[in-house]
């Protein structure tokens, strides 16, 4: 049986992309798989009694070493903020290429806590900062110092001791440019160094809380139980800064989505499913119910999605247990077709992720195909003609061409860059000033504009001639020729319409990171948790690959 890849016109709608969940393809999971054979060390731990100071953690294999340098800082409660305008954080971090010398640690002590204002060197690969969940951190310290383990209900509700507010890489603020390291096999997957930083920061939070508790009451203090550590991750607060990325990197976006679609296609094409694969799928599905029921949010938008997801998952489990025969040919194709007919988008994509769990042999080769040499596809084939371009637009953007951009509802929003932090923002063009500073993120509108310009022209007119008088649409001409080869490179939705839900764009990217517990705080920012349930560094050599579905076992 040959299953077609899913239609980009359906999959690339924001409501569907905003229903994606982590999977075996997610970057934090592929990072753990890649680095499980590396030697982990805590090389320096120089904190005072209150937990302030410097620590260094490393992964080493043969002659290659990556070192996380941590600077824990004392700040006032009124200085602690997750917003981008913050200037102080509880801790700041950089991932250093190699073994840092004392001079490096001293140099970076003056720069890393400044974050965007500081300056790094080519020796540094990533940069981040994080704030404590003060309520949780203080509770854990108090409990441990008195010889007790902390309240599991509180820890389950929050899920972390610290949350990061930004992770930077690839040449920002003096960090090493990607060309310096891109040929290293171990970091071939997207965002692998960023995942390493977050993973090691997680371990630092456990070590710090143990250290503070021990110094508070040396005679009675106990360490945080490893099982509890495992069930804690790192939180993250993410705003609109992440949204333009998926618009500005079309071939990379395509490769992420395409890997997922190929995995699903191949799984649906399996004629006979082995008993152990069937059982693993069902076990992960049932175990994941705990993840859904422990998903805390105050967002009405997300609560509705969670409620419907839980209802549909239970309906699906009942179908599997009572009505479905896994012995029939192509069982996962039957399952997928049933899901499309009977359940919501959130449930469909949730189960698609779980379908991948038994099939590491299918998924693992795809992990290596998720990066992109984007500059290869930047040049516009100017020898092509207008007729070619029209056909591409009609075939690849059919739904977008139906949008009427002459009405306010379709044109309501505009994207701009804030002056104070150089971060993306979204505004109402009919109520706020600044539309003259609009960023080129309204791809649907510009595609429609391009199409209307092409309509009266002769098909044999060359693209180079067209661009002489139409340079303002050059960016979407390029995108059209990209989507011709990369079908999942474009969001098939209006990113400036009144119905835009920006967190759908954030959630798409975060699902590929491997995030859990999406908790929208508005339609423009949300909190998530990463590495919750993941093995600890000293457990990496032999860990359960399905850890993400067994967080609270």
What residue ranges belong to the model's regions?
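Charged, structured surface patches that assemble and position nucleic-acid processing machinery
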Residues: 109-153, 157-165, 169, 176
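Acidic, proline/glycine-rich low-complexity IDRs
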Residues: 149-196, 202-203, 207-330, 334-341, ...
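Amphipathic alpha-helical segments
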Residues: 15-42
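Amphipathic, interaction-prone secondary-structure segments
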Residues: 33-87, 346, 388-393, 398-407, ...
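Alpha-helix boundary/capping motif
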Residues: 336, 376, 399, 411-413, ...
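Long, solvent-exposed non-transmembrane regions
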Residues: 2-19, 50-52, 65, 72, ...
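Long C-terminal interaction/binding lobes of large macromolecular proteins
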Residues: 347, 418, 446, 453, ...
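Intrinsically disordered, low-complexity regulatory segments enriched in Ser/Thr/Pro
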Residues: 62-125, 203-245, 255-256, 283, ...
């Amino acid at each position: 049986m040959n299953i077609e890849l899913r239609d980009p016109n359906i999959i690339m709608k924001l409501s569907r992309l905003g229903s994606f969940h982590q999977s075996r393809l997610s970057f934090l999971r592929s990072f753990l798989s890649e680095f499980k054979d590396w030697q982990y060390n805590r090389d320096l731990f120089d904190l005072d009694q209150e937990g302030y100071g410097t620590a260094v953690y490393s992964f080493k294999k043969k002659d290659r070493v990556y070192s996380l340098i941590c600077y824990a800082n004392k700040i006032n409660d009124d200085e602690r903020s997750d917003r981008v305008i913050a200037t102080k954080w509880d801790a700041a971090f950089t991932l250093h290429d190699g073994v840092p010398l004392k001079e490096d640690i001293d140099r970076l002590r003056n720069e890393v806590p400044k974050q965007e204002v500081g300056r790094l060197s080519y020796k540094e690969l990533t940069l981040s900062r994080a704030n404590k969940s003060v309520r949780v951190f203080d509770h854990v310290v108090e409990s441990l110092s008195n010889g007790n383990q902390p309240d599991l209900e509180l820890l389950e509700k929050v899920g972390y001791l610290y949350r990061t507010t930004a992770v930077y890489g690839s040449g920002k603020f003096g960090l090493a440019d990607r060309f310096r390291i891109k040929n290293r096999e171990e970091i071939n997957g997207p965002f692998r160094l960023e995942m390493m930083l977050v993973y090691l920061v997680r371990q630092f939070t456990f070590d710090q809380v143990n250290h503070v508790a021990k110094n508070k009451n040396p005679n009675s203090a106990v360490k945080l139980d490893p099982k509890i550590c495992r069930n804690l991750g790192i939180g993250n607060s993410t705003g609109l800064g992440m949204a333009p990325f998926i618009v500005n990197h079309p071939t990379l976006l395509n490769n992420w989505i395409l890997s997922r679609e190929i995995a699903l296609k191949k799984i649906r094409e399996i004629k006979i499913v082995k008993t152990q694969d069937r059982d693993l799928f069902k076990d992960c599905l049932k175990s994941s119910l705990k993840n859904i029921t422990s998903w805390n949010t105050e967002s009405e938008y997300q609560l509705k999605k969670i409620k419907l997801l839980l209802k549909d998952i239970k309906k699906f489990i009942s179908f599997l247990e009572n009505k479905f025969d896994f012995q029939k040919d192509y069982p996962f194709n039957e399952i997928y077709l049933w899901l499309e007919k009977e359940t919501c988008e959130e449930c469909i994509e949730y189960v698609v992720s779980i379908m991948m769990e038994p099939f590491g042999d299918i998924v693992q080769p795809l992990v290596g195909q998720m990066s992109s040499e984007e500059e290869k596809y930047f040049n516009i084939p100017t020898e092509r003609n207008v007729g070619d371009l029209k056909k591409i637009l009609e075939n690849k953007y059919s739904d977008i061409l139906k949008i009427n951009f002459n009405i306010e509802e379709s044109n309501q929003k505009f994207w701009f860059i804030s002056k104070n932090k150089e971060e993306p923002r979204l505004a109402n063009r009919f109520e706020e000033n600044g539309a003259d500073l609009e960023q080129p993120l309204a791809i649907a509108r510009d595609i429609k504009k391009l199409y209307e310009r092409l309509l009266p022209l002769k098909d044999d007119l060359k693209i180079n001639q067209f661009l002489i008088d139409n340079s303002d649409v050059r960016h979407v001409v390029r995108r059209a020729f990209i989507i011709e080869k990369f079908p999942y490179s474009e969001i098939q939705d209006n990113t400036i319409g009144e119905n835009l839900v920006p967190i759908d764009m954030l959630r798409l990217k975060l699902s590929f990171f491997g995030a859990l517990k999406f908790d929208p705080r508005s339609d423009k920012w949300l909190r998530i948790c990463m590495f919750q349930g993941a093995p600890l560094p000293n457990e990496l050599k032999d860990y359960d690959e399905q850890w993400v579905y067994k967080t609270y076992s």
